[in-house]
Every structure is written in structure tokens, then in C-alpha cells.
Amino acid sequence: MTIARLQRSVTLADVLVHEAGHAVAAWELGVRIGAIHVHMRVREGRVTFASDVGLGRFPAGSDALRLAIEREMVVLHAGLVAQKRFHYEGACGLVPRTDYEGILATALQVETDLRLIDEWSDYAEERARALIELPQTWRRVEALAVELARRPVLHGKEVDAFLAGVRVPRTANARLAYRRREAKERYCLSHNPEDREPVERAIAAARRTR
């Protein structure tokens, strides 16, 4: 579960992109989505997903368990990463407390050294950045943000069906999502305020047609 409670400088579009970032990352990584809820008037959003961690699905201490935890950490980071990609100035200094609490609680299932958890979280954040930077991922984030303006409550199967139907650009190398250093260096350079305008207009139009 992830909640974004946002400050005055953050727009409704920022909230929608934040939640879309969580959901698209989950969809891309095979983490099952429960539902997305966006409360328009208070600019608050929530994504729930069906965690595979802690259910006894993986042997304790196994590599499979650590990979499942890491996937969920990437999903939890992806909301703020997408928001910064969309509107960097509006996200500066923002701390989505519930996202970070979720990251810590998830990692604590296999690791108790907080220093190592911080390093692991940094790595998961880099993976989230690289994933969100992929053209096809970002196109899905934009499309889902606009759809959430029309339908602020979407359940997992609806999200799956919608994202599967989004037309996305082809990418030459899907492994780009895991090129950590290049993604980190490129991250702040990729933000262009003009990229925000078409999405904000589409969100405004979608709200008028509700």
C-alpha cells in the first residue's frame, strides 16, 4: 500500500502521476495490483498491491525472497521518481512518508542492518529511475494518469487491461532499465517542463468529461 499526501505546491496532476508511477512499475515488474484510489479534492492517492513477501511463498533468506522484496521496493520508490520526472520543482523536498515506511518494513523482513537497508533502498531507487525513464514505461505513466482523472478508482484487473492496451514506442534495448549509473546521471537532465503541458491539458479535459 502506498499513500501520497501532498503539499500545497503539488498539483492534482502531480498526484495522478505519482500514483500512476507506482502502478505502472508494479505492472511492469509483475507485482499484482489491488486497486488505485485518488481523492481529487484533498489531492491524495493510494495504490494497494498484493505482496508476495511474507506469505511463505519463498524460502526464508533465499535469493528469490530478496528479489521479490527488491521488486516491491522499486515499486514503492517509483511514485516519487515519476513525480520528479513529471514536475521536478513540485517534488523537491517532498517525503512520501508511507512509501518510505513501506520500503523499510519490506526490507526488514530479511535485513536488520539499517546502513545496508539504506544502500539497498538507494539501489532500488536507481532501478525505479531507470525503469521510469524507459519510453514505453513513461508513456504508460502519462496515459494512466489521464485515465485516473476520468476514473479515480481503478481495480487491479481494470489497471491490467488499460495498461496492456496503451500504445507505446518501441525501445531498442529493454535492458536499459538496469543500467544503473547511466540512469542516475541522466535522471535530472531528462526533465523538460514543456513535456508536462500536454498531460496537464489532457487531465483537465478528462475531469471536465466526468
Annotate each PLM feature.
Residues 2-210:
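Soluble catalytic regions of large protease machineries
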